Amino acid sequence: MLQKIDPKTLTMNPFTLIGDQWLLITAGTPEHCNTMTASWGGVGVMWAEPSATCYIRPQRYTKEFVDNNDYFTLCFFDESYRKALNLCGSTSGRDVDKIKECGFTVQAGAGNAPYFAEA
């Protein structure tokens, strides 16, 4: 279940979390979405608000979903999901239903943005 977390209470190292453990960027709706693995980006503060910065190449299928929706999610997983994260980073959602292949359970978050129950 999705829980709202005050970013100021986070104790994990963002360099390890993003750079070593990776994350999934997901956008669309719970019924029709796409996801991609990322191992780059950043977190910080912009205009006194917590923020995350994501960089997505224009040719990525996920970028179409991010551009066409108001919300997207960033999901982090433990090491047992490394194989799934590899799949999501090495195949295109145009060709493969990555979410089905990984066995992820899609949930609706803020703004109906899709996220994964397993994260």
Predicted regions and their residues:
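Active-site-proximal mixed secondary-structure blocks
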Residues: 1-119
